[in-house]
């Protein structure tokens, strides 16, 4: 099972992408086998394990899937905010979903998620830009 190493074992941070939009700076950085989507001054939005982009590194993201377990056969899902897309990836990988929609405020986020963070171009996934 992946997991972030202790702080004293972390490798140097490598900046992979940086863009500015109306809301500020968006960065993608890599530390070892992990990539992070950051908003603003190193505000970590998402963490992606490169070996499996559907792996949910943080407890709160795993907890967000609990609602899906209450439904015998979920067919659709709506995400208000895409981020790195690893929660979306996990749902597409592990749930029998036919239609998934993500609404993301910042237009560069989906492109960065696909280019650097392992978000797959899945035909079941529709990404819309807008204020959720």
Positions of the model-derived regions?
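Rossmann-like AdoMet
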Residues: 1-74, 93, 99
């Amino acid at each position: 099972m992946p997991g972030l190493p202790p702080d004293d074992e972390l490798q140097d941070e490598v900046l992979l992408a940086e863009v500015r939009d109306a809301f500020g700076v968006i960065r993608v950085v890599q530390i070892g086998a992990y990539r992070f989507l950051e908003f603003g001054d190193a505000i970590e939005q998402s963490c992606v394990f490169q070996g499996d982009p559907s792996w949910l590194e943080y407890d709160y993201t795993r907890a967000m899937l609990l609602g899906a377990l209450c439904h015998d056969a979920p067919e659709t899902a709506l995400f208000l905010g895409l981020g790195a897309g690893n929660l979306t990836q996990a749902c597409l990988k592990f749930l029998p979903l036919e239609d998934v929609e993500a609404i993301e405020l910042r237009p560069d986020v989906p492109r960065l998620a696909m280019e650097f963070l392992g978000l797959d171009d899945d035909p079941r996934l529709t990404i819309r830009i807008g204020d959720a």
